[in-house]
Amino acid sequence: MKISELRDKSLEELTQLLDEKQLDAFRIRMAKATGQLGNTHEVRVNRRAIAQLQTLINEKQRGDS
């Protein structure tokens, strides 16, 4: 999802997306550890998405837009 699309979402939606991404990150790490992960690029993409969501959540909590 693009950052501009994420900025339009509410704080509750962002926290829900963050929870989903963190669960995905856990699944990806487990797949990598067991050797079942074919595309290792997913680790980086997922970690970046989590960072973007955390940044947007912090901005909304502080009142910045």
Curated annotation (Swiss-Prot):
Q: Which Pfam families match?
A: Ribosomal_L29 (PF00831)
Q: Which GO molecular function entries does the Swiss-Prot or TrEMBL record give? A: structural constituent of ribosome
- What InterPro entries has UniProt attached to this entry? Ribosomal_uL29 (IPR001854), Ribosomal_uL29_sf (IPR036049)
Look up keyword RNA-binding and say if it applies: no
Annotated keywords: Ribonucleoprotein, Ribosomal protein
Cellular component per GO? ribonucleoprotein complex; ribosome
Q: Which GO terms describe its biological process?
A: translation
Return the similarity comment.
Answer: Belongs to the universal ribosomal protein uL29 family.
Name of the molecule in the record: Large ribosomal subunit protein uL29
Organism, scientific name: Psychrobacter arcticus (strain DSM 17307 / VKM B-2377 / 273-4)
- Gene name, Swiss-Prot/TrEMBL: rpmC
